[in-house]
Structure formats: C-alpha cells, structure tokens
C-alpha cells in the first residue's frame, strides 16, 4: 500500500486529480520494468493507458516533459526523454534510490544526497525500478491547501528534530561535565572512562551536526513550499481575475444583446401603435371622402335639374353652381388628404416590417450568443473535468452527454438496479469522511448559481429545464448520501425527464458537478447515476476507470 503522504502533504496524492482519478501508468504493469511510474496518491487511483496495475492501492501518474515535482531535496524535472532529473543529473537505477521520505511518502533521490543527509531517510522502499521517478510525490501545481498542510508537517518534523538536538545538547553538556569532573580526579587523561565519554561526546556532536543539516534542509524545503504557495496563489488570483473579466465581458455582451432585443421590441411596439393610428386616420378620411362624394353627387344633380319660368330662377341656378364648385373643391381636398393618409399609413407599415426585421436580427444575435455561452460552458465543463480527473473521465462525461440526446427515460427500477450494483462496489472505495464531505458540499449549495449552470447546459443539449427540479434533486441527493436510500432521487429524476428524456438528467446532474465541490467520489456517484440511465457500457467504462 502506498503511504498517504506525498511531497506536499498528507493529502497531496489526492491533489493530483481528485484522489487519483487521472492517475495512470503507461506500458505494462506495476510488477514489470516497462512502466513509467512517476508518483502515487492515497490509494484511490487506478492505472490506464496500455497497462494495468497489480498494486494494492498505490496510484501513479504519467508526468509530461518539462513538468516537475517538489521533494525535500530539490525539484525533480522530467526531461525530453521522460526521465527524472535532479540537480541536473538523470536519475537511474545506479545513481539513485527509492527511499522513505521524512513525511511518510516515498521519493526517488540521488544516492549522493542520501549519503550527504542519511538521517533524513528511513530505509529503501524495496523498489528501485529505474523507470520509477517517485511514489507519492505531487506536481508543483498541487493545491495550496495540500502544500500548506505539508508545510505544517515539515514544521512538525523540524520541531521534532530540534527537540532531538536539544536533548543531545543536554547529553553533551552532562557528559562534558562528567569529563571535567573526572579530569580533576584522574590527572592521567588517557583513563578509559574519560576517553569513552569523549568518544560519546564526539558521536553526539556528529548527530547534532547532522540534525543541524537536516533542519537547514527542511527549513529550505519549507521556505520553498511557502514560496510556491505564494506563486500558486498569485497565479490563482490572476486566473480568477481573468475569468471574472471574461465573465463580465460575456455578461456585458449578453446584456447589450438583450438590451438590443428589448429596444427592438419597444421600437416594434411603437411602430405598430403608429401604424394603428395611421390606419385609423385613413379609415376616418375614407369616411369623410365617402360623405363628401355623396354631397357632391347631390350638388351635381341639383345643377343638372334646371327649373325655369319663375322669378329669380337664374339666381338660383347660379347659387347651385357655386355650391357644386365648392363641393368639388372640398372633395378634391379630402381626397388628397386621404391619399396622404394612405401614403403615411403605408410608410408606417414599412416601418413595422423594418422593426420586425430588426427584432429578428437582435433575437438571432442574442440566441447565437446564448448558444455560444452554453457551448463555452460545456467546453469549460469538460476542461474542468480533464484538469481535475483526467481526459478519460472527461471523455466519459462527453459520451454521456452525447448519448443522452434523444434517449427516452427507462423505468426507475432498471436504472436503480444498475446503479446499486455499481454503488455497492463503490462504497468500499471511500470512507465516512468522503461521504461527509459530499453531504456538507450539498448542504451549502448556491442554487442561484446552479440554476444558471442548468440553463446553459440545457441549452447546449437543446432542451429546456425547470429550475424547480434542482431543489428536489439536491435534497434527494443529500438524503441519499446520508441514508443510503437512492430511490427517491431516481423517482425525482424520472419525473423531471418524463417529457424530454435522459438529456434532462444529464443537465441536472452535470449542474451539480459544475456548481458543487463534490470531490472525486462525489463526481463518481454523479456519473454513475447518469451512466445507469445510458447503459451498461458506460458503467463498465466508469468501473474500469475507477478500478472497481
């Protein structure tokens, strides 16, 4: 069994990909000389690539050219040939040895350093495979929390060695005092009692000097850890700032496009209102033209019917003619007004069409950005899975998402039976501490953030999701972790997916991966739940990856 502590701290093995998820070994198995065994975690990992492992819980990771990890005796860098280099020297079976380090792990170290500082080491690990760089060492980008834990462990080791040094100093002082007392009694200084004490003092002084060297080396290692913690914190701050800036820019872009849609909708509403008003004006003027046309027709008839033979008939005829001409002028005027109103109405109709086109363009732009945002979310999700748990795990997650599209939901009993079989083996792999950590993470869920993730992931899968189901799923998930009864969660998932299918379950459960720090085993449970709805093939892949 690989020891728990690595180059950075008690949990540093777990920092290399969530308790060993991305840990793998290339070429062959652990009992051969063909593998490249760079480092191990705390017993949760498995081996992948082209080989397999017969080790009892040890984990390993393939490190890339140029990567390095930290040991108490300096950095180990992987050269272009994939070999470990310390102090500029390629470590081989002849010039280096795997030894227990002071913190409970195992490291490959140059023999010259072992001879220089023997008291830092326990005994050899018994495995000096020249392809083995180190066991239980963490890469330099290990999490700050792990490095901080290791720094505290180093401090404890330093304190312990200082206590040993103080004890030795007391012993030296006591023996020197006895020597002085004996010299007063025995003038012949070659008296064997004196020489024995002097020899003891010399041996104790050598141990004290060695402890000084150890303490100096450990202080240097501690300072290096603290420096790296600062560097990692700065890098994390810079990355977080860049991420925040990107999110702000993306948010601003979406806000601008949402604003553009809102403005286009407002303009369309205004244009339609103006068109309605113009249409009403046209109808009013049409009624006026119709009325004046009737009056003009009557006036024309009055003129056409000439009645003569009474006094003043000529004056009457002239008056009727003037009335006709007035109506003709009025008709011409209202007819022109109608033409203008119709032209104005047609212009407003054109404005409505233009506003509708502008709205469509704004909506298309917003839709495109939202889709891009959703795609970016999934790309970021797979990248996160890759960084935390490895490419194989990310590939499984991607396969689950793709295979869920269009897949109808199966019965609760069938999916639950598949999951229970998987979970029964999984339960043996993680402890109550792991289970409590998952429960606590689910206790502190930010459902506002989770709902945003659900919306984006759902959009990328081209489905719609009700945010309300998140609360039910989160509650049932938490209760299942606490009680071991998973049926209520599967019932809730089936209810949520009855209209859309398995893609809804993927969206819901992946939202928890993105938004909740579930840890490696929490993610293993989530992907196991989703896989149980997809099929045995996906569960088999997951089992193989987890080594169960």
UniProtKB/Swiss-Prot annotation:
TM region(s), chain numbering: 505-525
Region Disordered, residue ranges: 1-63
Any Gene Ontology CC annotation: membrane
Protein's UniProt keywords contain Nucleus: no
Keyword Transmembrane helix on entry: yes
GO terms, molecular function: pore-forming activity
Family assignment from sequence similarity: Belongs to the channel forming colicin family.
Record function comment: This colicin is a channel-forming colicin. This class of transmembrane toxins depolarize the cytoplasmic membrane, leading to dissipation of cellular energy.
Protein name (record): Colicin-K
Species name: Escherichia coli
Gene symbol of the encoding locus: cka
